[in-house]
Amino acid sequence: MPLLWLRGFLLASCWIIVRSSPTPGSEGPGAAPDCPSCALATLPKDVPNSQPEMVEAVKKHILNMLHLKKRPEVTQPVPKAALLNAIRKLHVGKVGENGYVEIEDDIGRRAEMNELMEQTSEIITFAESGTARKTLHFEISKEGSDLSVVERAEVWLFLKVPKANRTRTKVTIQLLQKQPQGGVDAGEEAEEMGLMEERNEVLISEKVVDARKSTWHIFPVSSSIQRLLDQGKSSLDVRIACEQCHETGASLVLLGKKKKKEEEGEGKKKDGGDGGAGADEDKEQSHRPFLMLQARQSEDHPHRRRRRGLECDGKVNICCKKQFFVSFKDIGWNDWIIAPSGYHANYCEGECPSHIAGTSGSSLSFHSTVINHYRMRGHSPFANLKSCCVPTKLRPMSMLYYDDGQNIIKKDIQNMIVEECGCS
């Protein structure tokens, strides 16, 4: 259902931006009544003749998006000095050197952040017991190994504290990563990372924690995971050290089911239970260590790259984005619209031949590609459908304007500006 809604919205937006709906019988010989958005391609190429119609369509579109029946009438403009002072106080924009108001594009930044978050994967990997005592093994999933840019990586460990009195309230917990022979090239780098030469280990995270209550503790390991991914590796092996835990009776829950029973006695005997001993195995399993990884593909990853929509330059006749800017000053709307100075009323036009319509990056969705596959092969009921040039990516727009009561309104409007076009 969301997909159908999106397709309908994009088609409607494109139609509103470009031209008003034709009256019956007004369609020219090149019109495509079975594909409303395809009518964009039939616009007159003589821009001066078609511009008034375009501008009127843009006006109607803006008023509709602002939920206004008509433009506000500004009878007594607010003095410019008072306006600029209010904008500064409200932090809704800034005044440029030329005196024009520049609205802060918070919504644009949020949209970029949301797009980035959509491209980020979050993976949780539970620890397995390593080959040696007090070591943990984290195997990063196949999906994680396909990602190459680490946004955040953390190891979560549970510190269990008995109710008995303790002589120490703070303990230091260290995460040490075993290095392969020859794994560290530069001596200075190794020294900075805390290389333990006798064990060939690197200190990758350290934290002083409160030993008065049982709780989870988080250890950042982003740089270590990034190095592993850069080296093409998909697993992390760490040794957990807590030299002061035995003084407080505190213990770190380190083990999964593997090797738990054979090590818990030894761990408790030697250092106060650092091996994660506990009477209730199910409860201890709920405190099993895990690695939380947030990562994404790099910009130049082959699966990340996609074909950008074409810009209309007069040399192509296939589906492309046509730039069209309407200045609010030129249309007499700068008396009530404070910012921005105009509207990028971009629209889509061009043909969608069969070899383009189903191409990755040019089609609106996977659904469109499947439909085109059947359409090209003449399968009913898709044989008579036509592929249309429509917006495939839109971005929001922020507006600062006066209402009829001389109030200053800031409104963020979603899906207002066409960024890319493709074949539906």
From Swiss-Prot:
The keyword Signal applies. Residues 1-20 form the signal peptide. GO terms for biological process: activin receptor signaling pathway; androgen metabolic process; androst-4-ene-3,17-dione biosynthetic process; endodermal cell differentiation; extrinsic apoptotic signaling pathway; eyelid development in camera-type eye; hair follicle development; hematopoietic progenitor cell differentiation. Pfam families: TGF_beta (PF00019), TGFb_propeptide (PF00688). It is found in: Secreted. GO terms for molecular function: cytokine activity; growth factor activity; hormone activity; identical protein binding; peptide hormone binding; type II activin receptor binding. One of its GO terms (cellular component) is perinuclear region of cytoplasm. Residues 21-308 form a propeptide. Keywords: Cleavage on pair of basic residues, Disulfide bond, Glycoprotein, Growth factor, Hormone, Secreted, Signal. Its main location: secreted. Dimeric, linked by one or more disulfide bonds. Inhibin A is a dimer of alpha/INHA and beta-A/INHBA. Activin A is a homodimer of beta-A/INHBA. Activin AB is a dimer of beta-A/INHBA and beta-B/INHBB. Interacts with FST and FSTL3; these interactions prevent activin A interaction to its type II receptor. Activin A interacts with ACVR2A. Activin A interacts with BMPR2. Inhibin A interacts with ACVR1; this interaction creates a non-signaling complex (NSC) that inhibits ACVR1-mediated BMP signaling. Inhibin A interacts with ACVR2A. This is Inhibin beta A chain.
